[in-house]
A protein has these predicted regions:
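C-terminal edge beta-strand
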Residues: 6-15
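Feature marks extracellular polysaccharide-active and adherence modules
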Residues: 26, 66, 77, 84-86, ...
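Acidic Gly/Asp/Thr-rich repetitive segments characteristic of extracellular carbohydrate-active
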Residues: 27-64
Length: 186
């Protein structure tokens, strides 16, 4: 402007060069899990990519999640993981479970915290998510007023940028214990 003042508008655009990320998740990938594609470990599921990182990890690991719908229950236990989607409306991590849904692994109800589509455990310090939709796709209609959590975050120093949370009831659960700090930024 003529008065010397400048107004800046902030846009959250993720542009990662091939050196900007460590792992790729692509729902259309049909090769062997963890195989190198363009010098990057590549997986078809977020869970496989997350589980490829050691729980003793000490350095930031950036996972690029390509546009797509990933129907899976994800638990993050390793520190310093970043999940970066290509587009917050086109990169969707979803699961369908409520507190009364039977967990096929245990035969018991998930419970409220267990219904989460994504759980960030307390040891997953420094977790970040950017340009994603985290959704619990449970439909309450015809069911009894059940909680269906999209994100259960128990970790300290978590940051969520341009991340959409979609759920029916109790969408976001900040679930840290009283004795452990859990600074979470949304």
């Amino acid at each position: 402007t003529n008065d010397g003042k400048t107004t800046l508008k902030s846009y959250n655009i993720v542009y990662l060069t091939n050196d900007g990320y460590d792992i790729v998740v692509d729902s259309k990938y049909d090769g062997k899990s963890g195989e190198l594609v363009n010098d990057k470990q590549t997986y078809s599921t977020v869970t496989e990519a997350i589980n490829s990182i050691s729980t003793k990890n000490t350095e930031r690991k950036v996972i690029l999640v390509k546009n797509g719908t990933y129907e899976e229950k994800v638990t993050i236990q390793s520190p310093y993981i970043s999940l970066i989607g290509e587009d917050s409306e086109k990169t969707i991590l979803t699961y369908d479970a409520a507190n009364g849904t039977i967990n096929p692994n245990t035969g018991k109800n998930y419970g409220t915290s267990g219904s989460a589509s994504i759980t960030v455990k307390s040891k997953a310090i420094g977790f970040t998510a950017e340009n994603l939709t985290i959704e619990n796709s449970f439909v309450e209609q015809g069911n009894n007023n059940e909680q269906a959590v999209a994100l259960n975050n128990q970790a300290d120093e978590s940051i969520f940028i341009n991340t959409r949370f979609i759920g029916n009831q109790d969408t976001l659960l900040a679930d840290a214990s009283a004795s452990v700090p859990a600074r979470q930024y949304y």
